[in-house]
């Protein structure tokens, strides 16, 4: 919900799982959120940009979180396609 100034005033804004598009509930304590840093290709240094991925507890419980993060990183161009 937004006020007249356009600022969010909700106490809780739910996240969505990056792999399955499920809403991550407030009581899903098995979910994770990870920031993957983007690195300069020449110098190998962090360039102040990152991608954020949220993985719900159901994906982690199935053991698919590592494959999901790798697939998302390949789609975003963080990891090369032939890795």
Curated annotation (Swiss-Prot):
Coiled coil: none annotated. Keywords: Cytoplasm, Endoplasmic reticulum, Ribonucleoprotein, Ribosomal protein. GO terms for cellular component: cytosolic small ribosomal subunit; rough endoplasmic reticulum. Gene3D superfamilies: 3.30.1230.20. InterPro entries: Ribosomal_eS21 (IPR001931), Ribosomal_eS21_CS (IPR018279), Ribosomal_eS21_sf (IPR038579). It comes from the Eukaryota. GO terms for biological process: cytoplasmic translation; endonucleolytic cleavage in ITS1 to separate SSU-rRNA from 5.8S rRNA and LSU-rRNA from tricistronic rRNA transcript (SSU-rRNA, 5.8S rRNA, LSU-rRNA); endonucleolytic cleavage to generate mature 3'-end of SSU-rRNA from (SSU-rRNA, 5.8S rRNA, LSU-rRNA). Its main location: cytoplasm. Component of the 40S small ribosomal subunit. Component of the small ribosomal subunit. The ribosome is a large ribonucleoprotein complex responsible for the synthesis of proteins in the cell. Belongs to the eukaryotic ribosomal protein eS21 family. PANTHER family: 40S RIBOSOMAL PROTEIN S21. This is Small ribosomal subunit protein eS21. It comes from Xenopus laevis (African clawed frog). The lineage of its organism: Eukaryota, Metazoa, Chordata, Craniata, Vertebrata. The gene is rps21.
């Amino acid at each position: 919900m937004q006020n007249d100034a356009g600022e969010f005033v909700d106490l809780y804004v739910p996240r969505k799982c990056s792999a399955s598009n499920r809403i991550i509930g407030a009581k899903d304590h098995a979910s994770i959120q990870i920031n993957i840093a983007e690195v300069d290709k020449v110098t190998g240094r962090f360039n102040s940009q990152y991608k954020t991925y949220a993985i719900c507890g159901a994906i982690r419980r199935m053991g698919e979180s590592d494959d999901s993060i790798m697939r998302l990183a390949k789609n975003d161009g963080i990891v090369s396609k032939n890795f």
